[in-house]
Amino acid sequence: MTLIKSISGIRGTIGGRAGDTLNPLDIVKFTSAYATFIRRSNQSKSNTIVVGRDARISGEMVKNVVCGTLMGMGYDVLNIGLATTPTTELAVQMSQAAGGIIITASHNPRHWNALKLLNHKGEFLTKDNGNEVLAIADKEDFEFADVDHVGKYKEESFNQRHIDSVLALKLVDTEAIRKAHFKVAVDVINSVGGIILPELLDALGVEYTFLNGEANGDFAHNPEPLEKNLSGIMAEIRKGGYDLGIVVDPDVDRLAFICEDGKMFGEEYTLVSIADYVLSNTPGNTVSNLSSTRALLDVTTKHGGVYTAAAVGEVNVTTKMKEANAIIGGEGNGGVIYPESHYGRDALVGIALFLSSLAQKKCKVSELRATFPEYFIAKNRIDLTPSTDVDAILEKVKEQYGKEPDVQVTDIDGVKLDFPDKWVHLRKSNTEPIIRVYSEASTMEEADALGKKLMQVVYDMQ
């Protein structure tokens, strides 16, 4: 049983003892701490907090505890019901609320759930803000409202407003999409994508077949949108008659595509392809995290923009995007952030922009994929003992490779070594005694060999 506390919220498995899992007592504690932080931060005059959730089986229970606690803290609750993460983020903006809580464990298995915390802009809390919430929770330093100041409760859907905001984006070419008469297969893994994506696709004139479309939270397969989990939709597309496949995770902030031949487009290339379309229409800068493909750098340079890398984590990417004045950014796991809409990963925005690009180019998805540089990312891990000084090891790696003239060393998040034609990124886990090793090259064999080489370097340093 697990309970993990981080700056972005808390996540854990359902059931078990208080303090060890995500259970009602801990939900009350962290919700109260968040409400206390919002009150003290005084960033908004609003007394309303938005609550949205994915379709997980435990979601109704968690939602009831969260909403009751917020009301007990004196906040009015705007419950938007079964909603995607980006819908909840936009609802905070549109309602000018004081903040928001998203109840979702994203791509984690069905027995997990989590509270993700938003500020008054509908964006994830900064590291300092997140640490403040954790400190308040540790001290249990909160005060509940008296009977005359208990919060009110309201339910309202924001799905249509989210869809309308996507359709209103200048680069979403609804006319071209409708004329293309696309037929798609969509895997929404038994969650909220099954509620909102049919409405979006109907508005775009796209014919569709849904797999795992019932939003019951009983995930038909591992919910992370990786090739190893997507045999069902890949087989469906291979039957023929489809222009592409669309895959989202349970809270619809990650997006993957499948080519018309049933092969993966590549989750790293979701952002790359959409950025290429955006940059071709509105030149500018881009940002992705350090573990994302170099293809975004190539595409950005092609269009005359500047690429900047950020530390892993959505809040780090959005912060860097604002600093760099980036017009698009995100993460290589299929997370697309388009500030013209909002500063959050949004699969609805990604779908609409991708279909616009495809409709205008009048090509097959596999042909579009072939226009981008070919890179492969290998993922490995180094298991360490709990007593290992991981920071000291990473510092040694930095010192060793910092002396080499053809290696660019970046240390804002672990250590990343950029070689002329490949890179490797070493990050320590915040929850386990391990170092994650990501490496990229022009072939998978070369990428894996580079990762294994750095793993041996680390082993030799112990």
Locations of the language-model features?
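Short beta-strand-to-turn element immediately C-terminal to the catalytic PLP-Schiff-base lysine
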Residues: L117-H120, A256-E260, I337-P339
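Proline/glycine-rich low-complexity loops and linkers
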Residues: M71, N131-D164, C259-G332, I337
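An N-terminal, well-structured beta->alpha segment
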Residues: M1-G68, G72-M73, K152-V184
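N-terminal small/polar loop signature for handling phosphorylated ligands or for N-terminal nucleophile
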Residues: T36, R40, T48-W112, E199-I258
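Gly/Ser/Thr-enriched, mixed-charge loops and adjacent short helices
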Residues: T13, N113-R238
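Phosphate-binding and adjacent anionic-ligand microenvironments
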Residues: L244, T282-Q462
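Short glycine-centered, acidic/aromatic-flanked micro-motifs in structured strand/loop junctions
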Residues: G52-R53, V186-V188, C259, E340, ...
